[in-house]
Amino acid sequence: MFSAETIAGYLNGSVEGEPSTVVTGVARIEQGKPGTLCFFANPKYEKYVYTTKASIILLNRDYELRESIAPTIIRVDNAYEGIASVLGLFEQKKLANKKGCDRFVWLPWRFKKGKNCYIGAYTYIARGARLGNSVKVYPQVYIGENVTVGDNTIIYPGVKIYQGCVIGANCIIHANAVIGSDGFGFAPQANGEYKKIPQIGNVVIEDNVEIGAGTTIDRSTIGSTLVCSGVKLDNLVQIAHNVEIGKNTVIAAQTGIAGSSKVGESCIFAGQVGVIGHLKIGNRVTIASKSGVSKNIPDGMAMLGFPGMEASKYKRSFAVFRNLPALRDDVDSLVKKVAVLENNQEDKSQ
Amino acid sequence: MFSAETIAGYLNGSVEGEPSTVVTGVARIEQGKPGTLCFFANPKYEKYVYTTKASIILLNRDYELRESIAPTIIRVDNAYEGIASVLGLFEQKKLANKKGCDRFVWLPWRFKKGKNCYIGAYTYIARGARLGNSVKVYPQVYIGENVTVGDNTIIYPGVKIYQGCVIGANCIIHANAVIGSDGFGFAPQANGEYKKIPQIGNVVIEDNVEIGAGTTIDRSTIGSTLVCSGVKLDNLVQIAHNVEIGKNTVIAAQTGIAGSSKVGESCIFAGQVGVIGHLKIGNRVTIASKSGVSKNIPDGMAMLGFPGMEASKYKRSFAVFRNLPALRDDVDSLVKKVAVLENNQEDKSQ
Amino acid sequence: MFSAETIAGYLNGSVEGEPSTVVTGVARIEQGKPGTLCFFANPKYEKYVYTTKASIILLNRDYELRESIAPTIIRVDNAYEGIASVLGLFEQKKLANKKGCDRFVWLPWRFKKGKNCYIGAYTYIARGARLGNSVKVYPQVYIGENVTVGDNTIIYPGVKIYQGCVIGANCIIHANAVIGSDGFGFAPQANGEYKKIPQIGNVVIEDNVEIGAGTTIDRSTIGSTLVCSGVKLDNLVQIAHNVEIGKNTVIAAQTGIAGSSKVGESCIFAGQVGVIGHLKIGNRVTIASKSGVSKNIPDGMAMLGFPGMEASKYKRSFAVFRNLPALRDDVDSLVKKVAVLENNQEDKSQ
């Protein structure tokens, strides 16, 4: 439960109305009930500003009310951004309360962990693993030998982290993600079989990284697969062995980066993108969804298509593709006309 | 074990031969052994009708035997559909028997569950969660705070359901699926970092939904990500935050629906389809495998390609694409011929 | 810990220097420390041959040293392949040591397992399941009724194997893979709903198969989904019901094979490939990443594109696609020129 005053303080906002009004949750403006907080940002919803039953409403500082309203008002620079922070307030409060160790937890001999950790039931932590302060490990997680996890990191149920991997501070790893599974490396043999190339590197996840549900990150053959600080990976993403993902790069769901490719900083990859192995992708590269990248990409380029091309060029080519049958018809008709013209010229030259 | 009579009753069929013949399982017609039931639907297998060792055979009502056969016969309108029901008989019998609570189950204080539930070992059920009647929860499942699960729903091993999600009745959720993980929402900051936008909505799965292994469904930012009744999702499908999937829509493996898109009723999406965010897909839309959808689609349209186009139009364009080098050659040759023609005309006009 | 002599014996190599030199691990040549072994294969790193602090160095037999070096040398035909084997030595030693049964393991009545098995905590093994010799089952694994697992197979944390599946010998199954989930089969009903077609077959994995993290393999409707010996599947691969994958075929991450398709032997599929259902793919077929296969493919063909075509043909078409706007311009200009030519001819014929 938070008061208007507390929330306004948190948001650097100002209260109009009763500062002691309290709320226990957030609602959409059109569904606001007493005890909830709502916000107004999208003009389409303006009418609800005057009818909402919410107890507190977030308004932009420059919004002029046409008449007085019932809820306590908190004025902020940007109500839309403000609501995110309010949600964070509630969420963090709830999570921060979870600490201690459930029954049925497998801990190693001489286990090293920081203060205020939570470890859920049926979680297995192998020998040599270490947790920082305020780490939350949900139930049914596997943390292999010598894994280290930084402060404040949250590991959701069913995550599996193989031996020797390093997880930074302030990370969030969603359910059933797998970190440190063997890279996909095999040496073809003369008889057609493949011999496994042992993968004895690890995965290093730096700070402030979020990893989506079901995402898989393979360990390096030797050395480290590296996910730099601030990277955000969506669900079901595949990061192969020896890959490096630069700082603050964002990768949407079901994208795959093949072995040994290096992705720069501050890139944005949409969903279902594929990057083949051994490439170098620059900084601030944008790749449209479903695109396939098979060549190095310089800094700042926007890519689209399969095979991927510079986005604007691909769009121009695709615009013609849409009408290819008409182009074919034009050419067929030209062929006929030119034959007639050639015939006529020949007739005349005879 | 079921008798021919029981099975015929179940299928609305009629028995020819001994009604008390019993079977304990189903076999392919070419592999039928005593004590099994087989069916004949594909003409390619007709010879086996006369040689199978199965004890019971399902035949279409209109199939005329060329000679008498050993197995007891059950005549039905459609043997192929009939076999599905018979399989169901056996399967349901087996599953329905599972009830009770294994040891090593984590249950909350004052846990509310219906009759005839099964809860497997190492499953964690958080406070406030409720199960309906005859719910089967396999081992190693995580059910978060305040989750509700409707009657007869089956949750296979390793499924993780985050707090506050709602699962309907008669649903099946396959192993390692994740429901309610955070939506992929971040606000870019001036310094290049991204700030997490808390995702405090939930996921609502209505009745009769099947969800494949490893599929991920993210919770909404505010409100609900919604999967309507009768929807069938295959394996490794990604449903992003705020998405809605309409009634009886079927989505094949590895397809991804990006944030806030609304998919209509009775659509059929093949595998590896991608739908970008904030779109509206109509009812009864069909999308071919691997297609990318980047625009709204009206009711009933068939889509194909990347970027996606109306299927028939895409096919015509692609037919020309297949022979683009020939088209290029035709044009090159025309360019030369026209140059010659122009030259000749000029010569003559001089 | 291994001596130079032991390692040389294992690699069929010869020692130059002290055969009793021992190492406890492997390092990159530029990071070699005493007690480690390094290798030299990439000419870019040649200078480190003369400066590395590693205790043992693997060199190609034909490499000529320019001056004497400190480490003990092991000469082999191919240092790069050699290092893989050395890594294997260390890895296998570590793993082979793991045996016995953790506490909190769910074992069935009259459980049958071979010698030297390891079973991790929170693993559930259902009735009728059997493990061969030296099987390693990590924590939090689910092994359903009557599943059999062959000798030396390693099953990583969180793997779920449904009832009745058969896993061969010397297999490796990575974390959170799912084997034997229901095939995606539904019969449309007159009212728009879908009725589940029970999937009562199983999955058969032969020997020497590796299965990546998060990969899903569905059970057959009737009969078996079959993964033949020597097959290697990367992460997040989807194998649908009734599929067969031939011997020694390698399939990279996020590829999906739809229902009932048969893939031949010794094929190589890159990442994010899609194969639609009911196809027959020959032996030794190569499919480039992201390609979509919608037709049968004969032995030995290389495929590329979406829809997939013979790779060389696709590349030629795509080369024209890149410059389609220029082609369109050429045609437009031809149309004009031909109109002028026609006009002129007409003028003259008048």
Which role does the model predict for each range below?
Chain A
Residues 1-103, 170, 176-177, 182-196, ...:
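Terminal amphipathic alpha-helical/low-complexity segments used for targeting or macromolecular assembly
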Residues 39, 100-310:
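Structural signal for interior beta-strand "rungs" in well-ordered beta-sheet cores
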